[in-house]
């Protein structure tokens, strides 16, 4: 049986840990609110951009001069998966679930005979994927050095993807990230980024124009060539913002659970401490009484 001193030290240690997890929970809650606000602020722009792209892509998808970013290369032999996770842990199964989705997608594509390359955005995803798929990882990016996720962040990732596409390194690009459903629910998903026509069909309901005819100036092709990179960057930014919100939600839930578990452990240790102390006092009293009777 542990001594009273050992029990007291352990209770103090658990209380210190509880204070840390409670503080981390409060920090995650504050960051979650900011992340949700950022994601909600970006949503109207992304939706309107998708609607515009849907209209333009309808006019251009069947024309010979359509951009490969829009219609693809005509093949689907090589895939690029952009796996987005967090740089830090202590957020429950958030990172593990995204990596699990990425593994499933990689294995499914390889089973079909596809060539697969991976870009890891986030340290935790890279650390886990390199155990089994180190040869597939072509680039790793960490975001911990950036205080907030901005358009510049998505442009940096988008430029890398477009450079690889222009060099013929892949035919289809998918983003593997977390869809923020609620504080306690983050759903891993794989979303097509290139060809953009597939991403648009998947991500937006084509609006009913009511018979209206739209003129594009100077022309649809020129506008699409300008908007396609921006649209891709918008999709990437939206995924990054949802990922941050999901990470903070998972971290807040994990730290809340840890804080409650610490409280339960403290109660149990206090009970053991009191019983041990009571047993020790009883033993001492018994020894005193026995000694008195011997006299």
From Swiss-Prot:
UniProt topology in membrane: Peripheral membrane protein
InterPro entries for this protein: ATP_synth_F1_ATPase_gsu, ATP_synth_F1_gsu, ATP_synth_F1_gsu_CS
Keyword Ubl conjugation part of the UniProt annotation: no
Family: Belongs to the ATPase gamma chain family.
Keywords: ATP synthesis, Cell inner membrane, Cell membrane, CF(1), Hydrogen ion transport, Ion transport, Membrane, Transport
Record-level GO BP terms: proton motive force-driven plasma membrane ATP synthesis
Record's subunit section: F-type ATPases have 2 components, CF(1) - the catalytic core - and CF(0) - the membrane proton channel. CF(1) has five subunits: alpha(3), beta(3), gamma(1), delta(1), epsilon(1). CF(0) has three main subunits: a, b and c.
Protein name: ATP synthase gamma chain
Species this protein is from: Maricaulis maris (strain MCS10) (Caulobacter maris)
PROSITE patterns (alphabetical): ATPASE_GAMMA (PS00153)
Keyword Membrane: yes
GO (cellular component) term, any one: plasma membrane
GO molecular function per UniProt: ATP binding; proton-transporting ATP synthase activity, rotational mechanism
Subcellular location: Cell inner membrane
Signal sequence, start to end: none
Free-text function comment from the UniProt entry: Produces ATP from ADP in the presence of a proton gradient across the membrane. The gamma chain is believed to be important in regulating ATPase activity and the flow of protons through the CF(0) complex.
SUPFAM superfamilies: ATP synthase (F1-ATPase), gamma subunit (SSF52943)
């Amino acid at each position: 049986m542990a001594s009273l001193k050992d029990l007291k030290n352990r209770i103090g240690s658990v209380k210190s840990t509880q204070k840390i997890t409670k503080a981390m929970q409060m920090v995650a809650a504050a960051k979650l609110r900011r992340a949700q606000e950022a994601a909600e602020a970006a949503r109207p722009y992304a939706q309107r951009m998708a609607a515009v792209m849907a209209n333009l892509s309808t006019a251009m998808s069947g024309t010979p001069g359509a951009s490969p970013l829009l219609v693809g290369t005509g093949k689907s032999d090589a895939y690029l998966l952009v796996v987005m996770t967090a740089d830090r842990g202590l957020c429950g199964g958030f990172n593990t679930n995204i990596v699990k989705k990425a593994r499933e997608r990689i294995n499914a594509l390889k089973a079909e005979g596809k060539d697969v390359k991976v870009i890891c955005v986030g340290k935790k995803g890279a650390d886990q994927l390199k155990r089994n798929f180190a040869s597939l990882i072509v680039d790793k990016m960490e975001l911990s050095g950036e205080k907030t996720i901005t358009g510049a962040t998505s442009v940096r990732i988008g430029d890398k993807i477009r450079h690889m596409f222009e060099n013929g390194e892949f035919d289809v690009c998918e983003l593997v990230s977390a869809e923020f459903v609620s504080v306690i629910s983050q759903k891993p998903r794989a979303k097509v980024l290139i060809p953009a026509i597939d991403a648009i069909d998947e991500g937006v309901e084509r609006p009913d124009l009511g018979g209206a005819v739209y003129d594009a100036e100077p022309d649809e092709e020129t506008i699409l060539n300008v908007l396609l990179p921006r649209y891709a960057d918008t999709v990437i930014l939206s995924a990054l913002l949802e990922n941050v919100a999901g990470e903070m939600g998972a971290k807040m839930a994990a730290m809340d659970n840890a804080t409650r578990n610490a409280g339960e452990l403290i109660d149990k240790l206090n009970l053991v401490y009191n019983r041990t102390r009571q047993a020790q006092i009883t033993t001492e009293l018994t020894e005193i009484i026995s000694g008195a009777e011997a006299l």
